[in-house]
């Protein structure tokens, strides 16, 4: 079982049941100073967070990862070069690379390719798997054919996909991503934070549900969904 709370832009607060039956709390791309965020970094002071995953080093994804790691004691998981830089900030950082399965405490993860840019290490997406649910956060990415392979190999139940265009996939490209990944649930992200990434999540929902078997849930910042 998974509980996913949308924190605006590309940030999520996720609870997964671990392989040992214990819940693990995970933050994904935690830019909590985004203009849509319902929470502030200070709201996490003293909270239990196990892992913070960062898909790449752009400020709207790396966000408040260091501050949150210091406040919660969470380990930051990122591509190797970025993790090395973060460790210099005094946080516990786990470095990995694309395609290398990670066995973490109670959960598994693997970084996936992403078509984007990044100054420190390659841009990535990430699949995080608990006892009975796998969540794919695509990071910032354009559409690419190996999303089909991600679907076949890692079978994500939930896909968190950017739809805002300009820097990432737009609605049409994200629809094709759903066709390739074949998740049971898709949640749009990375839209309407700035004028450049205006998009209609309801149009995405309409297209996906009309042409695939995937359900789309459009979350407002602060809302959450439970899966299954």
UniProtKB/Swiss-Prot annotation:
GO-annotated molecular function: hydrolase activity
SMART domains registered for this protein in UniProt: Lactamase_B
Keyword Membrane: no
Keyword terms: Hydrolase
The keyword Chloroplast is annotated on this UniProt entry: no
UniProt similarity note: Belongs to the UPF0173 family.
NCBIfam families in the record: PRK00685.1
Stated name of the protein: UPF0173 metal-dependent hydrolase Tpen_1493
């Amino acid at each position: 079982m998974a509980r996913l709370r949308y924190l605006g832009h590309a940030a999520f607060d996720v609870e997964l049941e671990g392989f040992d039956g214990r819940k693990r709390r995970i933050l994904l791309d935690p830019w909590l100073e985004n203009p849509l965020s319902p929470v502030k970094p200070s709201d996490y002071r003293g909270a239990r967070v196990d892992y913070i995953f960062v898909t790449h080093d752009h400020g709207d994804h790396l966000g408040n990862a260091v501050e949150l790691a210091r406040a919660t004691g969470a380990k930051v998981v990122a591509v190797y070069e970025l993790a090395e830089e973060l460790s210099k900030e005094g946080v516990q950082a786990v470095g990995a690379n694309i395609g290398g399965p990670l066995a973490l405490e109670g959960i598994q993860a693997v970084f996936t390719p992403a078509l984007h840019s990044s100054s420190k290490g390659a841009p990535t997406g990430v699949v995080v798997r608990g006892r009975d649910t796998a969540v794919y956060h695509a990071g910032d990415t354009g559409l690419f054919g190996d999303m089909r392979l991600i679907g076949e190999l890692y079978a994500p139940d939930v896909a968190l996909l950017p739809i805002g265009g300009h820097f990432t996939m737009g609605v049409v490209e994200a629809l094709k991503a759903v066709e390739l990944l074949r998740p049971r649930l898709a949640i749009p992200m990375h839209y309407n934070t700035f004028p450049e990434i205006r998009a209609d999540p309801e149009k995405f929902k309409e297209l996906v549900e009309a042409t695939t078997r995937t359900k789309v849930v459009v979350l407002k910042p602060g809302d959450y969904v439970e899966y299954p």
